[in-house]
């Protein structure tokens, strides 16, 4: 879960500047993880047949066991995931290394074929947890996947990934870690060898699919397993510690009216001194 980016104005820093407080924040599913959930659901369904699941999606959330986290997990279950795992932890006790260690413990227990996760968290933007997890597992990592296609042998995946300079196409077999870009939401981005290649998914602009009313009702009965960092035998010691947080300087809020373009240019040059 992450603090809702749309409510960033509510962010507060503790008096000593050593922490960001969660008071008054609203929580939601990490948007990047929502993209990954959509990819995982497409990989494990026959979209040409209503409600035809051909695999299992297990959600993992790390955070406090409160109503917000429970709601977010239920949201993912309502979209189609089969079950959830909640690893209880305080938000302030996590960094990318701890998250990767927790996920490795879950992977060791669950033995999934793939781990599909957001490339970053919307609040921290570290963009390293997936890579650290893959290193701990000894699995290949494909970051910023924009399309996934199952090979003719049913074992190989052909993946296109976004680069700053273009697109790279790679093939991978066996267990792997994927992080996804928003292009995974395109109508033909995932071909799993079961859903007909001619099938076109609904066009998604921002996030994954919406939950149906039936899915919402079914999600209430789907299992969520609770565990803790200690139960998983994970060292919860952070390797990254922030020394200070500062809010940006407050704006004056003053409004100045200008008569014409010449007046605007004069004020930008002589008063604001930005040109």
Predicted segments, located by residue:
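Positively charged, low-complexity intrinsically disordered leader regions
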Residues: 1-17
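A glycine-rich helix N-cap at a beta->alpha junction
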Residues: 68-100
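Short Gly/Thr/Asp-enriched flexible loops that form oxyanion-binding sites at enzyme active sites
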Residues: 72, 124-139
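Electrostatically charged, flexible surface regions
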Residues: 10, 145-275
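Short, acidic/small-residue loops that bind anionic groups at enzyme active sites
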Residues: 113, 118, 132-156
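Residues at the starts of beta-strands that form the adenosine-phosphate
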Residues: 49-58, 83
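Histidine-anchored nucleotide/phosphate-binding helix
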Residues: 33-48
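Short, glycine-rich nucleotide/cofactor-binding loops
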Residues: 1, 21-36
């Amino acid at each position: 879960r992450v603090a809702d980016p749309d409510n960033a104005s509510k962010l507060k820093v503790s008096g000593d500047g050593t922490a960001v407080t969660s008071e008054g924040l609203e929580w939601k599913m990490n948007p990047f993880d929502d993209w990954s959930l959509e990819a995982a659901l497409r990989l494990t369904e026959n979209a040409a047949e209503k409600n035809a699941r051909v695999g299992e999606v297990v959600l993992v959330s790390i955070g406090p066991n409160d109503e917000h986290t429970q709601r977010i997990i239920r949201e993912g279950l309502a979209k189609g995931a089969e079950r959830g795992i909640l690893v209880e932890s305080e938000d302030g006790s996590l960094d990318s290394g701890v998250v990767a260690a927790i996920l490795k413990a879950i992977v060791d227990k669950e033995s999934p074929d793939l781990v599909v996760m957001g490339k970053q968290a919307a609040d921290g933007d570290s963009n390293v947890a997936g890579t650290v997890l893959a290193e701990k597992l000894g699995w290949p990592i494909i970051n910023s996947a924009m399309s996934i296609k199952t090979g003719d042998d049913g074992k190989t995946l052909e993946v296109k990934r976004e680069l700053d300079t273009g697109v790279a196409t790679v093939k991978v077999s066996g267990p792997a870690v994927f992080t996804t870009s928003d292009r995974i939401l395109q109508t033909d981005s995932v071909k799993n060898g079961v859903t007909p290649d001619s099938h076109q998914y609904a066009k998604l602009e921002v996030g994954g699919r919406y939950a149906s009313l039936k899915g919402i009702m079914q999600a209430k009965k789907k299992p969520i397993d609770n565990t803790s960092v200690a139960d998983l035998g994970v060292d919860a010691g952070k390797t990254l510690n922030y020394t200070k947080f500062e809010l940006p300087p407050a704006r004056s809020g003053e409004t100045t009216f200008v008569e014409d373009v010449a007046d605007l240019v004069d004020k930008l040059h002589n008063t604001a001194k930005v040109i």
